[in-house]
A protein has these predicted regions:
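Two-component/phosphorelay signaling modules centered on CheY-like receiver
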Residues: 12-36
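Acidic, metal-coordinating helix/loop segments flanking the phosphotransfer/catalytic sites
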Residues: 19, 36-55, 62-65
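Conserved phosphotransfer cores of two-component systems
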Residues: 49-51, 79-88
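Conserved phosphotransfer microenvironments
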Residues: 57-81
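Hydrophobic/aromatic residues positioned on beta-strands within the core alpha/beta folds
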Residues: 92-94
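C-terminal output helix
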Residues: 101, 117-129
């Protein structure tokens, strides 16, 4: 079986960290993972509304304010859970912001809040694997 994962973050270093964690997931699940990367909110929304994913890893703060259709990550999460093929897709919401309000909003839309600070690749990989297996 093969899994399809969307990694949406404007920071290339953060996308690489998620990629490393997903390599560990591949070993845990003993299955292949196709990783689709996006760097803007506009590109991310286009993927979320048109393609089915087994897991979504979503940033909050995209630096594409200059693009028409720009959305913050929390708005992308809300839209994904309301329309399109990813309503029930497990979604990890990554943010350097440790606001309780943001965390509450993420949980309201069935997302899993994942702080960028203290990112432990092995623990994160296990979280990703657990969510993919349950889907």
């Amino acid at each position: 079986m093969s899994y399809k994962v969307l990694v949406a973050d404007d920071d290339e270093g953060q996308r690489k960290s998620h990629g490393f964690a997903l390599e560990v997931v591949t070993a845990i699940l003993e299955d292949e993972i196709e990783i689709i990367e996006t760097a803007t909110s506009v590109e991310t929304w286009a993927k979320i509304k048109s393609e089915q994913f087994d897991l979504i890893i979503l940033d909050n703060d995209f630096k594409d304010n200059n693009l028409k259709g720009h959305l913050p990550g929390i708005a992308l999460l809300q839209l994904a859970k309301k329309e399109g093929p990813n309503k029930s897709t497990p979604t990890f919401f990554c943010s350097a912001d440790a606001y309780d309000t943001l965390k509450s909003m993420v949980e309201k839309y069935s997302g899993i809040y994942l702080p960028k600070v203290g990112y432990d690749i092995e623990k994160v990989a296990q979280l990703f694997a657990d969510k993919i297996k349950k889907k």
